[in-house]
From Swiss-Prot:
It comes from Pseudomonas aeruginosa (strain LESB58). This is Formimidoylglutamase. HAMAP family: Formimidoylglutam. Its EC number is 3.5.3.8. Gene3D superfamilies: Ureohydrolase domain. The keyword Hydrolase applies. InterPro entries: HutG, Ureohydrolase, Ureohydrolase_dom_sf. Its cofactor is Mn(2+). Keywords: Histidine metabolism, Hydrolase, Manganese, Metal-binding. Binds 2 manganese ions per subunit. CDD domains: Formimidoylglutamase (cd09988). The keyword Nuclease does not apply. Belongs to the arginase family.
Amino acid sequence: MYPAPDMSLWQGRIDSQEGADARRWHQWMRPYADDAEAASVLLGFASDEGVRRNQGRQGARHGPPALRRALANLAWHGEQAIYDAGDIVAGDDLEAAQERYAQRVADLLARGHRVVGLGGGHEIAYASFAGLARHLSRHERLPRIGILNFDAHFDLRHAERASSGTPFRQIAELCQASDWPFAYCCLGISRLSNTAALFDQAQRLGVRYLLDRQLQPWNLERSEAFLDSFLQSVDHLYLTVCLDVLPAAQAPGVSAPSAHGVEMPVVEHLVRRAKASGKLRLADIAELNPQLDSDQRTARIAARLVDSLVN
């Protein structure tokens, strides 16, 4: 059994005088049930144990409810149903929580839903991919899964235990054990936030990446071509956005704010482009830390990205 979602988070303005089309997220959201029609499902991963293990600033476990509150009052422009499936809460047993989250993702995908994960630290990424891999392995022997990560960091660290700095190394090891290709594309890498050892590791693993200074409006056509080339090489896409890819002025509420970062219009444009490929199977937003946020700026940006993924 999974805990029921806290529907009290879905509150906001009601513009009934403007008619039926004046809907907002909080009016459209429904609690998930197993007999729900295939639709978008929000699933939270309330964890910052991985951030703690990675020596970061804690508070991301409060990200999922903060993100729901930011979503609640946004105007709703979709026609399809949308459901809240509640949170998987990690505590200090991160590995067990990742397994529960992965199984929940696999079950939801098997029912035909489109899952959008709400973090939580970026340790959500390994759990998300594991769930997608579990689902696809039931139907394909050798699925070509692309991992598209908007992030200032490679998150390929060596460590004795899982953390927010290890998820894509864990995914690489999972792919190797399954004899699957490891197709990892990271957009927004900060050269000053990744050691030479991490760049060497990325090269050994065949990681495709663009630096934050390359992902700028004046270079958008090249960024689009780079992304399109990656998308053409895979059959299924897992997309994850670590909010520290954005400039600190836009997203202060993260463990490791970016001095440079990638502007929100560029990130949102490329997220929508990836979604338009028709290959997107699963997505999540990671590293929202409301305890470090200012005027809900980071939560509002995260909410806009979720809306871009759903509508």
